[in-house]
Every structure is written in structure tokens, then in C-alpha cells.
Amino acid sequence: KINPSVSPGMEAIINKSLVYNPGERFLSAAAMKEVLIALQRGQAVAVQPATPAISGGSVTSILPGQIAPPVGATSTLSIQSAPTGQETGLLTSTYFGITPLWVFRCEDEIRSQPLPVGKFVYVSVYDNNLYALSRADGKFAWKYASEGGFAASPVHEGGNVYIGSEDGKLYALTGETGRPLWSYQTGESVRCTARVAQGHIFVGSDDRFLHAISMHGGKRAWTYETPAPIRSRPYVLDKEARVFFGCEAGEFFCLDFGGNMKWRHRSKRAITSSPNFVDGLVIFGSADYNVYALEASSGWTVWKQRTGKPVVSSPAVSEKAAYIGSADGNLYALDLRSGKILWKFETGDQIASSPAIYKNAIYFGSVDGFVYCIEMKDGKLRWKFKTEGAVISSPTVVDDVVYIGSTDHNLYALTA
């Protein structure tokens, strides 16, 4: 039943906090509190889209008793309508005058990392589909529908694509046509991106197990049980025959290729971040606000660096530094040997996107709706591109093109 005592101003605030697109909600609890206090005092309430339009948003003031406009009504950005799952009209950002090479619009949010291989770019979407698009112009090639959305990103090996789904399955498809080869059922959603090595696929599931699966036929080789869901993508060292990954209970594991634990490390909170490896170090982030560097052979902590909020972003590494985002809105450059902060770059909101390094630049997205390109040496901004939603997707940069998705339902191809 409708509660007549709820004012239009309160209704507008509640609607904004519950809107489907995270980028259109309040930027923080503090921002929502400020508006609620103003409403209580009978002041004008400013409800502003959390991600202003490319050509500039405006603030809508709602006085007590007034009716709020629909969320996003102040946006002046127009995206050409296109048939579902086809390329849209090109958008030009007023920030640095950037025009995408092409844009492909899907039916739901894109939170995964696009995978350009050969003539295709593959992207998994919450509309339950894995898409294959032309890298040249973004034209639709094929799509494969699962029974659940895709939070995991696709991987490609031997001409085939492998991807986990919310329906609990890992799918193997032909890369050329999307024809299904086999599927492997786990006990819960698969939000972990798989890793292919030594003829096997290593993938975590919300059923708390790491699964080792044969590439040929999808038969189980072994499983390893952990205390919590696994969403951290495994890192595999072929020569040492080691598999590294974290779980949501805050534990980080090193297994051999037979599924036997060699060592484990405990952090204080969940490890969603996927590890990277460089010079004998395994580096990853944790929800306990820290970035860790562990000795790969023993699990001994070489260093840890605290950020301002949880770290779900995964690190990119160079010869001298590790680069990783934090929910405090900063991208950090950390010295590989000491963990010392070399520099940090501040964005307008949380960073869940994992950075990519390409030609002395770093590319990543932020919940503030921007795709950023910054200098690797000092963190200076080169350019930024505005989307109409939070950018949780991680970029892939190949042949001078940045492929990245947004919660605005679009996949963007940008010139690097």
C-alpha cells in the first residue's frame, strides 16, 4: 500500500538510492545522509545524477511537496537507439574530445573484461549472453546464452572459449561460431575467471571449491575445498607447477598440480582480487584494505601496503612497480621491493576495475563513470572518457585499441 505520509522529496531520495544502475545512485552513504538531513529541515533537496552526462549534467532541486523528475531526466547525452545487441551511434566525450572507434550496446550491464582474439572480441554480459563481435567495427557475429548472467570473463585457448556462469556451469565453446562443446557443472555460481594451463582449466566457484577440469571433454581432474566462495582468478606457474588464488574467507592458497596445498596465507578479510606474479613475488589485494606481496615459494610476507578502503582490483605489474586500484578511489603505484607508494592517482569514486599496462600508459575504469589513461612513470593524466554508468569492467588493450565495458550496457572500443 502507498504510504501518504511519505513526501515526494523522500520518494525521490529512496528511488535514487535503489535505482538499477549503480552509477546513478548516491556516491556515498554520507551524501545520502546530507540530503536526508536537508529534507528533514525543510530545505531544498538537490538530487543529482551520480554520473553526470557527457555534455554536462545539472542539479535538480526538489522542494518539500514537489514531484521529482525521473532519475536521469537531467542527462543530455543521447545514444542512438539500435536493434538489441547491435552497434550504436558513436559518442564523443567532451573530455579530451574522444570519439570511440565503435560502441556496441547490450541488454544489460558489462562488468567483465573483454577478450580480443584474432578477428573477434568476446564479451560476457549480465543479460545471460556471451557475445562475439568484429574487432574491426563492432558488428555482431554470434552470441551464446546461458541460464544465468555472466560475472566471469571469457578466456581463449586452442581456438575455443571457456567461461563460467551464474548458473554454476563452466562452458566450452568454439571461438569461431560459439557452438557448445561441453559444460561442467559446479555446485554454485561461477564468478571466477578461469585459467588454462597444462591441458587443464582451473576455476573457482561459489561452492567453495577450486576445480581442475580437463580441456578435452570437461572431465574433473580434482577439486580443492576452501572455507568460502572463490572469485579470485587463479594464477598458474607452469614451471613450478603451482596454482595461486584467494577466497572470500580471506585465505590465500598455493597448491601443486595435484591439488595438494603447499602453503596458505591469511588476511583479515575477503580476497576477491586476482594474484599476479613477478620476480618470485605473488601480489594481490584484500578487502582488509591491504595490498600483499608474498614470496611465491613459501608464502612469507615480503611487504604489505595499506590503502584507504577495500581492494578488489587486481594488480598489473612492471619491472619496478605494481599498479592496483582501491575502493578509496585511488590507483596506486607501489614499489615492487618495498611496497612503498611511488604515486597515486585519484578518481571520483571506487576503483574495482583492474588496470592494464600498454606502451608506458595505464588504463582502467572507475565507478565515477570514466575510463582513464595515465602515465605509468608518474600517474599524470593523459585522457579520460566518460561513459553513462559505473566502469567496473577491466580494460584489454591490443593493437592500440582499448576495449572496455560499462554498466551503461555498452562495450567501447577507444583509441589508446
Residue spans of the language-model regions?
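Short amphipathic alpha-helical "recognition" segments used for binding
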Residues: 15, 20, 36-37, 44-47, ...
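Extracytoplasmic/lumenal domain signature
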Residues: 66-69, 77-111, 115-191, 195-416
